[in-house]
Amino acid sequence: DCELVDIRLEQEIKTEEIHQALAQAKPHGISILEVTPVDERLPALQTVVEASEFSVTFLDPADDLDARCLTMLTAEKLPRLWRSKPYDLRPLILDLRLLPDDDQGHRRILVTLSAHEGATGRPEEIIAALGYSPESTRVHRERLIFKLTVPAAG
């Protein structure tokens, strides 16, 4: 999975030292992939995320997944409810494609969803809109897509 952490330090520390300290303090199963300094005048990193890409593995049979994905992609609207408020899921789907089955023969998709404030697509909504139970899937966020390239500080 892919997470982003935006940390403000009171004193300047070399990125290698920060990486090493985080690597020693992290819980088992979490990897620190990158430490990059950014100009503190820039917006918080979470506010410049444009989209998130998720892989979804269907643990139960999903023989008609191809047809359901095509129906979803060709739909003009996909009305849904979130916290009792109606919204259209379709414009939040930036990309949806089939992936090769995994080693156990489970069907998989890759979906890229909008991550704008007030317009964030959620993988469990895609799964439910396809007619499957979110509880019968494994979802992994593969990457974050940013609105802009954040220049390194310095």
List where the protein language model places each region.
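Acidic, low-complexity central loop/insert segments
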Residues: 23, 27-41
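Core RNA-modification/binding signature centered on pseudouridine synthases
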Residues: 74-154
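Helix N-cap motif at beta-to-alpha junctions
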Residues: 10-15, 61-63, 116-117
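Short glycine-/aliphatic-rich beta-strand segments at the starts of folded cytosolic domains
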Residues: 3-7, 48-59
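Short amphipathic alpha-helices in soluble, non-transmembrane regions
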Residues: 15-26, 65-75, 125-129
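Conserved loop-to-helix interface motifs that mediate assembly, gating, or partner/ligand docking
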Residues: 44-46
